[in-house]
From Swiss-Prot:
GO terms for cellular component: chloroplast thylakoid membrane; photosystem II. The modification Phosphothreonine is found at residue 4. This is Photosystem II reaction center protein H. One of its GO terms (biological process) is protein stabilization. It holds the Pfam family PsbH. The keyword Protein biosynthesis does not apply. It comes from Mesostigma viride (Green alga).
Amino acid sequence: MADTSQGKRTVVGNFLKPLNSEYGKVAPGWGTTVLMGVFMALFAVFLVIILQIYNASVLLDGIPANWSSLSKY
């Protein structure tokens, strides 16, 4: 039976090999988990704002939001 555990070497594989050199290594502590949580919360707020604008539940003074003009085309 042939040993196929090494796989085939390709030009693309050789190019991408350095990107996988950190495989299995874990940074000590929480790392950037807190930063990721902050950005997730900001993204959630952004989505809520967009949803409220779309549903016209947020009144924007001086900015008309007429969605019917988009359906003419």
